[in-house]
Swiss-Prot record:
Gene3D superfamilies: 2.40.160.120, 3.30.70.3490, Pleckstrin-homology domain (PH domain)/Phosphotyrosine-binding domain (PTB)
Chain's gene name: OSBPL7
Native species: Homo sapiens (Human)
SUPFAM superfamilies: Oxysterol-binding protein-like, PH domain-like
Phosphothreonine carried by residues: 171
Entry-linked Pfam families: Oxysterol_BP, PH_8
Protein name: Oxysterol-binding protein-related protein 7
One example of a Gene Ontology biological process annotation: bile acid biosynthetic process
Family: Belongs to the OSBP family.
Tissues of expression: Expressed in epithelium of small and large intestines (at protein level). Expressed in stomach, duodenum, jejunum, ascending colon, spleen, thymus, lymph node, trachea and leukocytes.
Keywords: Cell membrane, Cytoplasm, Endoplasmic reticulum, Lipid transport, Lipid-binding, Membrane, Phosphoprotein, Transport
Keyword Translocase: no
InterPro entries registered for this protein in UniProt: OSBP_sf, Oxysterol-bd, Oxysterol-bd_CS, PH-like_dom_sf, PH_8, PH_domain
Amino acid sequence: MDFQERDPPFLPESAQSSKPSSAQQASELWEVVEEPRVRLGTEGVMPERQEGHLLKKRKWPLKGWHKRYFVLEDGILHYATTRQDITKGKLHGSIDVRLSVMSINKKAQRIDLDTEDNIYHLKIKSQDLFQSWVAQLRAHRLAHRLDMPRGSLPSTAHRKVPGAQLPTAATASALPGLGPREKVSSWLRDSDGLDRCSHELSECQGKLQELHRLLQSLESLHRIPSAPVIPTHQASVTTERPKKGKRTSRMWCTQSFAKDDTIGRVGRLHGSVPNLSRYLESRDSSGTRGLPPTDYAHLQRSFWALAQKVHSSLSSVLAALTMERDQLRDMHQGSELSRMGVSEASTGQRRLHSLSTSSDTTADSFSSLNPEEQEALYMKGRELTPQLSQTSILSLADSHTEFFDACEVLLSASSSENEGSEEEESCTSEITTSLSEEMLDLRGAERCQKGGCVPGRPMGPPRRRCLPAASGPGADVSLWNILRNNIGKDLSKVSMPVQLNEPLNTLQRLCEELEYSSLLDQASRIADPCERMVYIAAFAVSAYSSTYHRAGCKPFNPVLGETYECERPDRGFRFISEQVSHHPPISACHAESENFAFWQDMKWKNKFWGKSLEIVPVGTVNVSLPRFGDHFEWNKVTSCIHNVLSGQRWIEHYGEVLIRNTQDSSCHCKITFCKAKYWSSNVHEVQGAVLSRSGRVLHRLFGKWHEGLYRGPTPGGQCIWKPNSMPPDHERNFGFTQFALELNELTAELKRSLPSTDTRLRPDQRYLEEGNIQAAEAQKRRIEQLQRDRRKVMEENNIVHQARFFRRQTDSSGKEWWVTNNTYWRLRAEPGYGNMDGAVLW
């Protein structure tokens, strides 16, 4: 970010020291602008908008100044490289001048704005322009001062829903007397409690904004020269004003509201309320000595009262959600639940889950309910989601102090681990804590909602939630000894130790791209072709989300003729893949569903460049939606693993994805995976747009490939997709998602149905999953030698390998691709692979 950490400008009265006279003179040139005093007759004066180019000091010392375009409006000073960037919303940062300590140097025509965390140094060339900027900054600070008495209590704090209006036990007890479908329908239609929850959460959000503003006002009053000195026994409420050259942390929080969570902060605010109460009592009983000014005491009382209201509102919401939980549990445990359709049970579970996580995604399917029930459930889910989603959290950021360029996060992928997910999930941390045990009891239905199950489809058998053995460290493997002789070579031809692998195969990684197949199901139900393109784009981005925690290991390379199947009735698709070529290595796959078809053939080129490993995919991803006759195709972007030999490995994806519908040219989509730069904060960011035939932007997309994709203007927007939360102890399970944990699972029934070439039967991969490293390494060497022997025999006899379940096609331009020959599932059913001879691969 563009700022330089240094001591605040010297105060004139603090310049009395034994330093040389030149230092004293230099310090006396700086003037700290005092807090504006309210004057009669100024209430109606509104500050003007000020904009123009200013010089801003660079982050690093001795690096000089650079020109930035600044806009001062409503007390917020935004800056960017050019005026066009301001218009487009591409800001480098923003400063709340109302809550900053302002210092000016008239001789040097400089302005310093101290936000406590950062100091922004500005220089203005023209004396007239300098005076104009100083005057406008003073005016905006004065306007904020005038508004403080009126705004100390927010307008949203006036209404409070009494606890008597919450759903009563009588309402809950009335449900068991109804039939199964009538009970669910009545529950879905009863929106009074959820309406109040929605309203309460909306008001809480406004109250939290006001609490943050009051908190910053208190801190601002506390650190300016005229601030009162609070006795040391009141340290629980405030801290001593920092002396020259020393900086202290904030009083009640350590991060800005723009970076912190929203409702997750309530726990800390609640902890501060008793301290404020004790402070006010002790203040009243301690006489007039050390009393703060009227404004300071008024702000403290306002903060205490508003925090009490936030706590009361959240208690009401918790009571309402607890009642919803009890109703769901009663229906789940009732004897008639076994006669209730799976679709209704999963729909009810999705409803409760949407309340607890405040997800901004639309429910995937309502096919099992009648139209009235569909509409009721849809409206209920959408009423709550805009208010606690990342969209609304991001929209608050413009009005607060800390806007960072944040180049530090480039050095470690873990520095922003699951930021978007944490922000959203922490919003309801206190509420969902009491629901977590019940949610675990119904985790199958929860996975259905988050993972993409379609209501009305069978749930399938229970899935495992961890690997048989924890992942072992691979630090004892000398990567440098392996790679130093292979710089610039294709690493797909280099044999690696098994410790560098994860217990999944490249064929299974192709299937992992279908983790969010619910996006394709959703697209198949949308009539607008441009809207369908938005969900196809979200699906293309979601394929990369699972790689965020997987930079430390690589998948097994499949041998020629190896296959993999994945039949998921709960998700509504079945998938097959096969290694159709060895040199070059090409993996082909095909998935089919009643709503979509998905296929691709992909080959990778791996290059080692000393400190990073670059993976360049070559091929095309295809998706067809039979309902509309659409055929979408797009390319994949380059992936790069950094710090291969030392430090914390992290992965990034960069390049441009072009999505087009070969059957409809009315729109197309371009998505850019931004490459990390040292001086930029766009690590892991994606930016894109759905464009019309003429190039007009129809939908603007933005987000991060590991956190979510949003539609609309930044920083707000509608959440189209966000990744599922990671399983517990995912670090001990190779960083696998829940879906990845299930890919290599092998049951006795499934083993009887698989062909002998299926990846699940590969011994080296199975041994690694079980933690037997020595056996895995021995089996890996044996399997690789068998493949070399087979290839030698085929070359000596001029035998060309023929793929078993895929066939190659070529167009008039010579482009080749692989498609399924539609024999896999037919042979699996009759005569069955257990009754057929297969290739011996291991």
